[in-house]
Amino acid sequence: MATSVIQFGSFVCNLPKSQPLCTTVHCPKQSMSTNIVRPSDPFAELEKHLEPYLQKRMDATIRQTKGGTLVYKHMSEAKRARKLRKKQREEEEVRLFMNAAPYIVSNITIGGGEVPSKMEEVSIKRPLNKTPSRKIKKSLTPVTFRDGHMNKFLRELRDCATRNSMTVHLIGKRKTELAFKRRASLNAVYATLHHMRGVDRKRDIVLEEWMNDYVLNLSKVSTWGSLFHAESLKRGDSGLILNARALRGKFGRCSRGFFIVRGKSDGVVLDARSKLSMATVTHMEQYSTPEAFWSGLEKKWSVVRKPTAHTCKPTYSVSNCGEVAAIIAQALFPCHKLTCGECSKEICDLTSNECVQELYKNTSLALERMNNLHPEFQHIVKVLSVVRQLTEASNHGTETFDEIFKMIGSKTQSPFTHLNKLNEFMLKGNENTSGEWLTARQHLRELVRFQKNRTDNIKKGDLASFRNKLSARAQYNLYLSCDNQLDKNASFLWGQREYHARRFFLNFFQQIDPSKGYLAYEDRTIPNGSRKLAIGNLIVPLDLAEFRKRMNGIDTQQPPIGKYCTSQLDGNFVYPCCCTTLDDGQPIRSAVYAPTKKHLVVGNTGDTKYINLPKGDTEMLYIALDGYCYINIYLAMLVNISEEEAKDFTKKVRDIFMPKLGKWPTLMDLATTCAQLRIFHPDVHDAELPRILVDHNTQTCHVVDSYGSISTGYHILKAATVSQLVLFADDNLESEIKHYRVGGIVENHKVQIDNQPSRCGVSEFHAIRMLIKGIYRPSVMYELLSEEPYLLVFSILSPSILIAMYNDRAFELAVQIWLEKEQSIPLIATILTNLAAKVSVATTLVQQLQLIELSADQLLNVTCDGFRVSFAYQSALTLLTRMRDQAKANSELISGGFNEYDQDLAWTLEKKLSRPLTRPMERIKLAGKISLLLVLKKAKDSFAVKYQKQKFARCQRNIQFITETIYGKGFLPHESRSSVHQARN
C-alpha cells in the first residue's frame, strides 16, 4: 500500500494512499448532425474591437468635473506599463514560491533579531493612591441639523426681523443686505442696491446661487401675497422684493420666483438683477430716495454747526434754502452730479491759477442768480461778493513786468535783486502765499535801508585802489575728481564724448604736418600783429644752456593797468571781467607757457590741469584753425557734459553757434553763446576755461591751447569758469575787453557790436543742390534725411523737384526713418506727398505755384515745433514764413481775378531751379555713357523683336525722350538710329 509523507518540524506523518476505483470512464459519443448551423455572436467583433479600450478603462479612475459630470481619468501609458511590470513581478514571485522544493521552517524571526517579548522589562504594577471621583458624567446628545431645522430657523429669523425692523446680511463673496421695513401698513423686504449708494452699475445687485433660496424664503412677508401693479410703484420702492406671480402691468424679466424693483425705463419696471446697458442706466428713472444724503447732512450738521447764543427761528422756507444751497454748491464746486468722481477729478486737475479763475467766474454767476431769484438772502450775497473780490485777477500788468525786467532783470547786485523780487511778487498777484508776503516785506525793508544809506560822496571807479589778485587756490572741478570719470591712471575718461568731439576736430582743427616742421606753426598771425606759440619747444635740447635760452620769452610790452583793463557795472568793478593784478596794483604779466602733446590745459588759478585730448583717427597732432582758437573753450565745456548729452551739445556748437561766430568773434558774442548753452546744459556753469591772455596793444584775447606761448607780457583775464565768462554778455557792462576779438587770422572781417545776431543756416540754392544730388544717389538722400530732415521743406521751391522727390519715394523714406523718433517729420513728409499729388495734376506752372503757396501755412504750423538742433531748421521756417505772408498778401488779388505771377519770370525761375534735374549725366564719365547707351539699344532691339510695330514705335519714342533728356537733343548716334530703323522694318 502506498503512503504519503507530511513533515512539519520534527513531526512526521505517514498517510496511506487510496486506490482509485475506476481509472477509466467510458462515455458514449453522441452523434452530431453536421447540418445544424450554430448562431454567431453579434457582439463578438465589437468586443474584439473594444477590448484594448475596455482593458485600458479597467485601470481608469472616476472624477467629477466643475460642471458636475463624471468622467474617466485614464492612466498614462508609462504608468500602465509600470503597473503591468509590477503585477508580472508579483505573479512571478508567487509562481516561484509555489514551485519551490519543500523545506523545514524551524524558526520565525522579525528583522532577524531577538524576540520583542524577551526585550521588555518586567514592571510591577501598583494601584494609584487617589480618592475615587464621585462626579456623575453626563453624556450629551450631539446636535443634528436637518433640512427642516433650517427652514424653521429662517422662519423664526424672518419673524424676528419683521417685528424689530432689522437688517439681515447674507455673506458670501459679497455681502447682500435685506432690510425689513413697513410699506403702507404692510411688512416688506428691501434689498440694498448699488444705485442707492450713488453707484451706477449695469447689474444693480448680484446674488450668488445659494442666496436665491434664502432671499425667496425671507421675502415671504405680508407683501408677498399682495397684488402689485406697475403704476403703483414709485420713488422709495428701490430694492422692494415682490412675488413674481402677483405682478400686474409692464414688468421686465425676472427669475427664481421673485422680483427686485430697480426703476422704470420706457414705461417698463426693471429687475435689479437684469443686466442693462450704461445708456439705459443713465436715462432710466430709478426709484431711490435721497435719504442717504439727508441722513448724512443731518448727522454732520449738528456736529459741525456754529454755536449761537440766540434761539433759532425758521425765517426762510425749506424750498428756498434748498435752491440757495444748490447755487452755493455750484459756485464753489461746479459739477453735474455731487456723487460723480469724474466731476471731482476735473476740479482736482485744475492748477491753482485755473481754480481761482473758475471760482471768480462761478461766484459772479452765483451773485447774479441770487440777486434775481433770492435777494432776501443778503448774508449769502455778502459772502459771495467777498469771495469774488478775493479771487479777482490782479496780475494783468505783464507789460510793466516786461519793461522792468528788460531794464534791471540781468542785474545781480543790490538793490536791483530786491526790485526784481518785488517785480515777480507783483506779477503773481493773488497767488502769493503768506510766506511770500513776508519775504516781500523784507525786500521792501532792504530797499528802504539802501535809499537811506545812499550817499553821493562815495568815489567810484578809482583805479588807485583797484586790486584784482589771482586766487592761490585752484578751482575745484567735480567732473575731474570723480572716480567714475577717471581710469586706473587717474586720467579723464571721455567715453561717448570722445566720439562726438570729432565734430570739432573735423571742422575746426587741422593736422600738423611733420614734414613742414614745428616752426611752420609757431607764428600765430593776428590782424594787428602775431603771437609766437611754444610748439617749437616740443623738441627738447639736451644742452642745459640751450634749454634755458629757450625758456626765455619775447616780451610784448603791454601797457600798465588802466580803464581798458577793467569792467564796471553801475560804477562797481566786475572783478571776473578784469585783468588780474599783484598786491601793489601792477598787472600780472604772462610768462612762457611750456607746450604739451595731445592735452587740453584748463585753469588759470593755482596749478593748471592737463586733460588728455580725445583720440582721433590718427596719432597726428591737431591745432586749431586760424581764427578758431576759441573752440578750445567749447572743448573744455564738453568735459562737464554728460555722455548722453554730448551729441546734442556738439551739434549745437557746430551747426548753430559756430556759423554765428565765424572767425574772430568778439568776446561779448562768445560769452553770449556760452550763456545760451548754459540754459540747455546747466552742468557747464562751473566748467573750467583755458587761460585767456589779453593783448591790449592789438585788442585781442588769446585762448592758450596745449602748445603754450613764447610771447610773454600779456595781461591775464581773471574769468576762470563759464559762469564768470558769461558776465561779458551784459549790454550794461562798461568794458572795453568785451569788444576785443578772439581767434586767429581775420579775412574781410567787420566787427559786429549791435544786438542783431548773424544769420545762420543753409541757403536755398545749396539746399536745392543737395536735394537734387540725393534724388540720383539713394545713399546721399538717406544721409540727408537722417541728419537734416528739414531739407524736405525746400522741395516746395520748385514743382519739378517736388514731383521728382515724390517719384523717388523720398517722402516715404523720411516717414520710415523718423516715424518712431519725431512725429513732426513724418507729418511734414505726408503733407508734401499730398501736395506733390495735387501739383502733378495742375495744368500750368502758375497753378502749381499757387497750390504750393496755399500749403505754406499748414507746413509752417507743423514745422514750427520749438527748438531743434538742425542746420536747415531756421532756414526752413524763414522760407515757409515768407511764402505764407506772400500767399496772404496775394489773396486779395486772386479773389479779384488778377494773376499776381509774371509768367515769364516764373518760367525762368523754374527753369533755373530744375535745370540740374534735366542734366544728371553731365559729370558721368564716357564709359558710363557708353554703357547706358548700349543698354538702351539692347532694350530697343528686344522690344522690336517681341512686340508689334505700333507698340514698338511708342517704346522707341519713350527711349528717345529719355536719351535726349540725359544727353541732349540729337545725341542718339547714327548707328543706333539705323539699327532701330532696321529693327522696325
From Swiss-Prot:
Q: Report domain Peptidase S30 positions.
A: 144-287
Q: Where is this motif: Involved in virions binding and aphid transmission?
A: 595-597
Q: Where does the Peptidase C6 domain lie? A: 621-743
Cystine pairs annotated here are: none
Q: Where is this site: Cleavage?
A: Y287, S288, G743, G744
Q: What is its EC number?
A: 3.4.21.-, 3.4.22.45
Modification after translation: Potyviral RNA is expressed as two polyproteins which undergo post-translational proteolytic processing. Genome polyprotein is processed by NIa-pro, P1 and HC-pro proteinases resulting in the production of at least ten individual proteins. P3N-PIPO is cleaved by P1 and HC-pro proteinases resulting in the production of three individual proteins. The P1 proteinase and the HC-pro cleave only their respective C-termini autocatalytically.
MF terms per GO, please? Answer: cysteine-type endopeptidase activity; serine-type peptidase activity
Broad enzyme group: hydrolase
Which residue ranges does the UniProt annotation give for the motif Involved in interaction with stylet and aphid transmission? 337-340
Name of protein: P3N-PIPO polyprotein
Q: Can you tell me which residues the record assigns to a coiled coil?
A: none
The domain comment in this protein's record states:
The N-terminus of helper component proteinase is involved in interaction with stylets. The central part is involved in interaction with virions and the C-terminus is involved in cell-to cell movement of the virus.
One Gene Ontology BP term is: transport of virus in host, cell to cell
Any one Gene Ontology cellular component term annotated for this protein = host cell plasmodesma
Q: Which domain of life is it from?
A: Viruses
Q: Which UniProt keywords apply?
A: Host cell junction, Host-virus interaction, Hydrolase, Inhibition of host innate immune response by virus, Protease, Serine protease, Suppressor of RNA silencing, Transport, Viral immunoevasion, Viral movement protein
